[in-house]
């Protein structure tokens, strides 16, 4: 290499040309972003998506193929739903969020009440609120609250296959990996 990108504390340059930076990983990520920019999908609703008439979708959002958007769903500006995402009724997603393929948001949580020798389903009547700049990995599931709200805070990132149970409150800028 003609030049090495190294942490500030790197002390073994041995005559090589180096560029010292505070956070080499962050700088490399920025360089890769310039060399390989992300191409956002076009705004709009794919013709195979099924969208309830009461859903409110910002004109700059992108709804991918085979998505299902339920009653009273709200989707913010520049949010992207990739293929086969399901948003149950009442789900709210903020701006600039990315929901990868196969996510299910707002399905019933695992709520049951013992009734003698059997179980009865505990009604799940809450909803899900997802903040701004959230990214949900493929096939992530977030259950609606039994009562109230299941919440994912601004800037939070969830890995593929993560499951968030009903009534969970995930704060801002949290990373969760499966």
Language-model regions: role of each:
Residues 3:
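Short, Asp-centered acidic motifs that coordinate Mg2+ and/or phosphate
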